[in-house]
């Protein structure tokens, strides 16, 4: 897959302009009302919001490879901010589209690309197989596929141009942190229990970053004080919280703490962060 070269001076839009013209709309409309079911902590206020979801295929200029993605839109009269969702190390599962729907119900046009699809066709149903395939992804390919998602959102008439953020979980949290070093046009990044990039790369970050971490996840949390100090020294906006009584991946059903109060508290903080940085 050909990659768009990022030029921090010109910005990603210049580097990947025209990507939207290579978009193939696939187009199975999945929701015209409630969307996919949100399985944890759903609130009545969210249920009242009408959303529409569809599968699309994104393509970068000059490449035969396409990226399968699920997107959802809120029904609103004005333009909305956009959010890219990055899946876990297991590939795209049934859970990530529910995250997209939750964001749409909160007023965002959101999309989750299947980052295995441009190379392997789509994510496998078996988590172990997905993990093995994710391990084979080159960082440049992941960045290119995320650029395609960014360009797609930025081209939509329903999205306020430029008001785009990213959120990732587990491996996706690591990619969210890394993508903030590669895309100077991002307005906000949320890292859910992800590892930071190397110290030199941190200097390239422009977007404010919110970190969501679990108390019982020492392997991931160990570097946080040093990373926070480094980003503060660089003048970067980075805040994080470690949620008590939770384990790695706690925002996903079935993980330690996923049925406790910290899930809704974390989501409240995530949505407040996006509203502050991207607008409502």
Report residues per predicted region.
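Gly/Ala-rich beta-loop-alpha elbow adjacent to hydrolase catalytic centers
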Residues: 168-172, 176
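Alpha/beta-hydrolase fold nucleophile elbow
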Residues: 158-169
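C-terminal catalytic histidine-bearing segment of alpha/beta-hydrolase fold enzymes
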Residues: 232, 237-280
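Serine-hydrolase catalytic machinery in alpha/beta-hydrolase-like enzymes
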Residues: 46-49, 55-155, 250-254
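Short beta-strand/loop motif that positions the catalytic acidic residue
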Residues: 211-213
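Acidic catalytic loop of the alpha/beta-hydrolase fold
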Residues: 216-221
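A conserved short beta-strand
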Residues: 185-194
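An N-terminal hydrophobic leader/cap segment in hydrolases
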Residues: 15-59, 67-68
């Amino acid at each position: 897959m050909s990659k768009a070269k990022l030029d921090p001076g010109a910005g990603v839009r210049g580097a990947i302009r025209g990507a939207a013209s290579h978009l193939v709309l696939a187009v199975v409309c999945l929701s015209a009302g409630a969307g996919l079911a949100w399985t944890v902590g759903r609130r009545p206020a969210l249920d009242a919001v009408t959303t529409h979801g569809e599968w699309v295929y994104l393509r970068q200029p000059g490449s035969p490879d396409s990226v399968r993605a699920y997107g959802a839109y809120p029904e609103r009269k004005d333009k909305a901010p956009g959010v890219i969702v990055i899946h876990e190390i297991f590939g795209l599962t049934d859970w990530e589209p529910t995250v997209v729907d939750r964001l749409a119900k909160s007023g965002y046009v959101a999309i989750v690309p299947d980052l295995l699809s441009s190379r392997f066709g789509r994510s496998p149903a078996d988590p172990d197989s997905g993990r093995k395939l994710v391990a084979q992804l080159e960082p440049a390919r992941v960045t290119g596929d995320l650029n395609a998602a960014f360009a797609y959102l930025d081209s939509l008439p329903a999205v306020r141009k430029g008001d785009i953020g990213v959120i990732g979980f587990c491996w996706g949290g690591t990619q969210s942190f890394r993508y903030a070093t590669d895309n100077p046009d991002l307005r906000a990044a949320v890292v859910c229990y992800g590892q930071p990039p190397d110290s030199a790369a941190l200097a390239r970050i422009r977007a404010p970053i919110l970190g969501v971490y679990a108390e019982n996840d020492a392997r991931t949390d160990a570097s946080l004080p040093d990373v926070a100090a480094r980003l503060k020294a660089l003048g970067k906006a980075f805040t994080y919280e470690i949620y008590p009584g939770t384990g790695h991946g706690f925002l996903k059903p079935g993980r330690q703490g996923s049925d406790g109060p910290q899930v809704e508290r974390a989501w409240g903080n995530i949505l407040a962060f996006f509203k502050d940085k991207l607008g409502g």
